[in-house]
């Protein structure tokens, strides 16, 4: 081992050397993709980003039943097919479990839209999502899915289709890569990080932060901004040194403030080892990972402490101490009175669902963003359990609603989105007048899911019945630059044996009218990915009609494929 010395290396040199090293480690196809990304990144090194923007991707694993997430309203031309074919899973607009009506403003003013096309209903467990939609904070994109090329029922048997079309694992990877016709190498967020990383000057941690472990969507090709995992409790710490290193350090934010006890001496010895270089490449590689983890831990810890210094004006714990604003907001939204809890005990948050804890941590990291020093941040979170082949929930023959898994899942989603959105609005108000103040326009949350589920149920009993694997699904976006109160794309006619569904099936598997890249490319552009780099991040995008327009033409499948109607973001 030798003493560590810094070797002067600017970004351009580092990236060039990284590209050269890749030539000996990957195949020619991977290397060409790598080089394209490096070329795009090098082209951006002369510019920098002056504002802050955070993209949050929420993946609903298991394939949520989008047919009961967004339903046609009573006046919608698709309603008759919904009532006829949804069977025991159908959710009437009245009854003991009423749905929530919404009106798509863009379709209400669209002359070419069929009469009543603007009327929809949201699942009964989504009252706050209805409010988000009505207020303009949230929009929905209909019938999005993985596509190799534009596809319709008449070409289904003659064009290339996404491999393993109805397989969970394959479709999850294809949504995250946006390259369904290629073996997985990287995710679309990872490729964005490859391109934008050079403009994130002086960043403290990676652009790519995951609250749901290592994932596919943030996997890059160049590894200049590898994904960094944070738990619901914060950064992963070294074990054996107490909470926030209280047994070894006098100041948790100063990694050299060692105590004179055995824990302090042990941590100092460990730190000294990390300050050496190692001749063995594996040893040095491991050492670098541990060292970077310790540094990231400090930055994340500082960001979370910064966020928690913002106190709620009324919420106090069982000892009369004020709660951090964001934590109290999430607790209140989930019906938990924080006054009976001890806010120094992290287990108090155990009553929150996992999705809520993930979004709470993301909200805190956004509030503490100055400690992370990234102008662009990519967050990933997830919520599983949506594979409702049974026990989905529906009405029995005597008109009594039998609650199921979809009800519980939508309730968790509703509360988490509402609490997160409330925190983003409140953060804008709290920081008003500060330097680099946060704006509600500074974030977008976008959902993904494996695929939709069949319109027709797989049984005729409300309790045990569910739905099966399908294709085109409905996703949503939330944030200040989202053109809210609108439904984009094209909503299916819900005829399970018609032109919208896959041939040979009478279950209602909608062929997507919008590809994953047509939905995600606007998100990349919002992050300031240049037009010339979009083709590098989304190589298949030019196979489809441009999503950067508001043209709407529902006169036929060809017209819909030519006019995707994905103009859901402002300022791009």
Residue ranges and their predicted role:
Residues 2-412, 422-432, 477-478, 486-493, ...:
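Feature for exported/extracytoplasmic and membrane-associated proteins, marking the mature portion
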Residues 370-373, 434-439, 462-468:
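Short, conserved, surface-exposed binding loops centered on an aromatic residue
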Residues 376-378, 440-442, 448, 470-473:
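Active-site lining segments that contact anionic ligands and/or coordinate catalytic metals
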Residues 449-486:
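Histidine-centered active-site microenvironments of extracellular/periplasmic hydrolases
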């Amino acid at each position: 081992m030798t003493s560590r010395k810094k070797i002067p290396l600017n970004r351009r040199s580092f990236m060039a050397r990284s590209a050269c090293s890749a030539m000996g480690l990957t195949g020619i196809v991977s290397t060409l993709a790598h080089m394209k990304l490096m070329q795009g990144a090098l082209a951006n090194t002369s510019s920098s980003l002056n504002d802050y923007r955070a993209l949050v991707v929420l993946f609903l694993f298991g394939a949520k039943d989008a047919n009961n997430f967004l339903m046609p309203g009573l006046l919608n031309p698709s309603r008759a097919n919904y009532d006829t074919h949804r069977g025991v899973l159908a959710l009437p607009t009245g009854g003991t479990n009423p749905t929530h009506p919404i009106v798509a403003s863009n379709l209400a003013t669209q002359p070419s839209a069929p009469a009543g096309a603007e009327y929809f209903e949201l699942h009964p467990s989504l009252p706050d999502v209805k409010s988000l939609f009505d207020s303009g904070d949230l929009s929905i994109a209909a019938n999005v899915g993985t596509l190799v090329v534009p596809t319709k029922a008449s070409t289904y048997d003659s064009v290339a289709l996404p491999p393993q079309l109805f397989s969970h694992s394959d479709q999850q990877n294809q949504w995250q890569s946006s390259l369904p016709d290629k073996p997985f190498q990287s995710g679309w967020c990872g490729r964005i990080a490859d391109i934008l990383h050079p403009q994130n000057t002086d960043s403290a941690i990676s652009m790519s932060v995951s609250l749901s472990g290592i994932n596919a969507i943030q996997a890059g090709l160049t590894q200049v901004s590898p994904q960094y995992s944070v738990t619901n409790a914060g950064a992963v710490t070294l074990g054996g040194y107490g909470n926030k290193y209280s047994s070894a350090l006098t100041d948790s934010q100063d990694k050299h403030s060692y105590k004179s006890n055995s824990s302090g001496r042990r941590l100092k010895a460990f730190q000294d080892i990390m300050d050496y270089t190692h001749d063995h490449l594996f040893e040095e590689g491991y050492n670098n990972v541990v060292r970077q983890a310790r540094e990231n831990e400090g930055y994340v810890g500082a960001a979370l402490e910064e966020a928690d210094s913002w106190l709620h004006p009324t919420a106090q714990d069982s000892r009369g101490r004020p709660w951090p604003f964001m934590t109290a907001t999430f607790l209140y939204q989930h019906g938990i009175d924080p006054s009976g809890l001890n806010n120094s005990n992290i287990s108090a948050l155990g009553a929150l669902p996992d999705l809520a804890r993930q979004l709470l941590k993301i909200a805190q990291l956004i509030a503490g963003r100055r400690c992370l020093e990234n102008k662009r941040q990519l967050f990933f979170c997830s919520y599983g359990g949506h594979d409702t082949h049974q026990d989905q929930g529906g009405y029995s023959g005597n008109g009594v609603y039998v609650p199921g898994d979809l009800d519980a899942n939508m309730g968790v989603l509703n509360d988490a989105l509402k609490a997160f959105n409330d925190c983003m609005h409140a953060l804008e108000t709290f920081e008003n007048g500060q330097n680099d103040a946060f704006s509600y326009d500074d974030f977008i949350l976008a959902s993904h899911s494996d695929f939709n589920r069949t319109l027709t149920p797989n049984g005729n009993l409300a309790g045990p019945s569910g739905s099966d694997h399908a294709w085109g699904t409905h996703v949503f976006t939330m944030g200040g630059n989202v053109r809210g109160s609108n439904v984009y794309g094209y909503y299916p006619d819900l005829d399970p044996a018609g032109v919208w569904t896959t041939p040979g099936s009478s279950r209602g598997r909608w062929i997507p009218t919008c590809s994953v890249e047509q939905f995600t490319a606007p998100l990349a552009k919002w992050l300031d990915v240049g037009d010339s780099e979009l083709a590098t991040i989304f190589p298949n995008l030019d196979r489809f009609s441009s999503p950067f327009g508001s043209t709407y033409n529902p006169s036929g499948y060809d017209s819909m494929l030519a006019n995707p109607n994905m103009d859901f973001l402002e300022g791009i």
